[in-house]
């Protein structure tokens, strides 16, 4: 059975329009032990994208959450896989 955790937070972009985005991240630990994630980014209830999604290198769920959050924050800053 897969173990899944949902995290929600807001992130303010530091450049461009400096909007505050609502972010949802779903982190799952696969049966192999590898962590993966999917993210959804919204602004004013409008879907802006998922960013790019790759497997995580983290070994614990806490590390996976931190790694996924850092990745999506970087994607928001650089508009990678997202619309402003």
Question: How would you describe each model-predicted region?
Answer:
Residues 5, 16, 33-38, 53, ...:
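Broad hydrophobic/π-residue packing in well-ordered secondary structure
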Residues 45-84:
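Mixed-charge, Lys/Arg-enriched low-complexity segments
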Residues 7-9, 23-27, 37-39, 64, ...:
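Hydrophobic beta-strand residues in large extracellular and virion-surface proteins
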Residues 1-24, 46-48, 84:
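Negatively charged, low-complexity tracts enriched in Asp/Glu with abundant Ser/Thr
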């Amino acid at each position: 059975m897969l173990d899944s955790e949902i995290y929600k937070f807001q992130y303010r972009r530091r450049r461009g329009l400096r909007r505050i985005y609502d972010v949802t991240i779903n982190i799952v630990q696969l049966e192999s032990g590898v962590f993966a994630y999917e993210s959804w980014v919204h602004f004013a209830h409008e879907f802006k994208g998922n960013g790019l999604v790759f497997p995580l290198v983290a070994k614990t769920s806490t590390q996976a959450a931190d790694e996924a959050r850092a990745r999506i924050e970087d994607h928001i800053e650089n508009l990678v896989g997202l619309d402003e």
